[in-house]
Structure formats: structure tokens, C-alpha cells
Amino acid sequence: MNRKSIAKGKLVRRFGVNIFEQPKYDKLLKKKPNPPGMHGRSRRTKVTEYGKQLIEKQKVKFTYGVSERQLTNVFKEARRQHGVTGDNLLALLERRIDNIVYRAGFAISRAHARQIVSHGIIILNGRRVTIPSITLRANDIIQVKEKDSLKKLVRSNIEKTSTLRKLPDWIEVNADALNVKIIRTPSRDEIPTLANEQMIVEYYSKRA
């Protein structure tokens, strides 16, 4: 297991949930359910309200692989929109182009999806893009660059992930043409993110 895998394993154990949505971390949590450095049934330190909010914020930050600045900007945009700020926050993160690549099964992880976008493998509405943080909207279409080796890679990823995760109803995936159409913005119950978004809103609201 490489250093990055070890670090992800520690994060999963710290949060107590599989934020990376990969089977190996479910197995890890069953084997080692306690946070790193805590053995057996050691008593947990009481967490303050601020501490709880921070944990929820960190969950989302590491789930989507975004920086602190990026997450702060997403919160500001979510607050400007109509509706529930917490729901808006998660919906904006879900509609990042790297997350769409991941949800569609074109990549085995979000980190891999970011690489795919950064390397110019994805075409958005007919134009090549290299920015993983682009937010997609209804009727946007992404597809894989016309290159046999790239298509072979993505098809292999689709095959690997097909039994691991369910395709969301708010995107339409054509596995043959290797394209994805955004149908609509996802509702909260369609987002499997394991975090309390209201606590994240409270965290940022106190710092606004």
C-alpha cells in the first residue's frame, strides 16, 4: 500500500465513514473501526460544537478533493442561490466536471477523474477543457477525446466500476459513445455524500 493509500485510510478511520466510496475502505472500517491512535474501546474525547462542524467540513473537502479556498468559494455561491444553502453546496460540488467524470464511471476515483480532466481527455460541449473545477449545467455534454487508447482506458474503467456504484438519475450516460449529458441539478436525496451539510453552513456562516 502506497503513502497516498495509507493517508486515505487514516482519513476514513478518522471520520468513521467511507468518504471515498471504495470497497477497500469498507473493509478497513470493519477491521479497524476506531480512529488512528485509538485502540480497543478507548474513550473518545468529547468534541465541541465547533469541532463537529469542522469535521463535517473536512469530510466534504476530502470527499471532493477540493482546497479550502475552493470550498469557501463554493459556499459563497451556494449562499447566493435560491433554496437551501446546504443542498446548494453539495449540488455545486456534485456538478463539478471531475465529479461527473467519476459518477459516470469514466474514472475509478475522484483523484483519477481530476487527472483525466487535467490532461485534456474530456471535451465539454465540443471544446477541450483542462480545469477540474468547472461546474456543469443542465444540457451540458461531456465526452472522451477521439483517441483509441483513451477510449480503451475509459471503457476499462466503466467495466471496473459498473458493479461498484449506481449511475445517478440526474445524468445520462452513453457507454458506447462515451458521453454524458447533464439532465438536471441533483436533489439532496440523490447525493450519497456522507456529511451533515447544515453543520458546514453553520461553520462558514460564523466566519462570514
From Swiss-Prot:
Residue stretches spanning the membrane: none
Cellular compartments per GO CC: small ribosomal subunit
Taxonomic superkingdom: Bacteria
Ranges of residues in domain S4 RNA-binding: 95-157
InterPro entries: Ribosomal_uS4 (IPR022801), Ribosomal_uS4_bac-type (IPR005709), Ribosomal_uS4_CS (IPR018079), Ribosomal_uS4_N (IPR001912), S4_RNA-bd (IPR002942), S4_RNA-bd_sf (IPR036986)
Pfam family, any one: Ribosomal_S4
Listed GO MF terms: rRNA binding; structural constituent of ribosome
A GO BP annotation: ribosomal small subunit biogenesis
SUPFAM superfamilies in UniProt: Alpha-L RNA-binding motif (SSF55174)
Keywords of the record: Ribonucleoprotein, Ribosomal protein, RNA-binding, rRNA-binding
Subunit-structure text: Part of the 30S ribosomal subunit. Contacts protein S5. The interaction surface between S4 and S5 is involved in control of translational fidelity.
The family this protein is said to belong to: Belongs to the universal ribosomal protein uS4 family.
Role this protein plays: One of the primary rRNA binding proteins, it binds directly to 16S rRNA where it nucleates assembly of the body of the 30S subunit. With S5 and S12 plays an important role in translational accuracy.
Name listed for the protein in its UniProt record: Small ribosomal subunit protein uS4
Species for this entry: Borrelia duttonii (strain Ly)
Name of the gene: rpsD
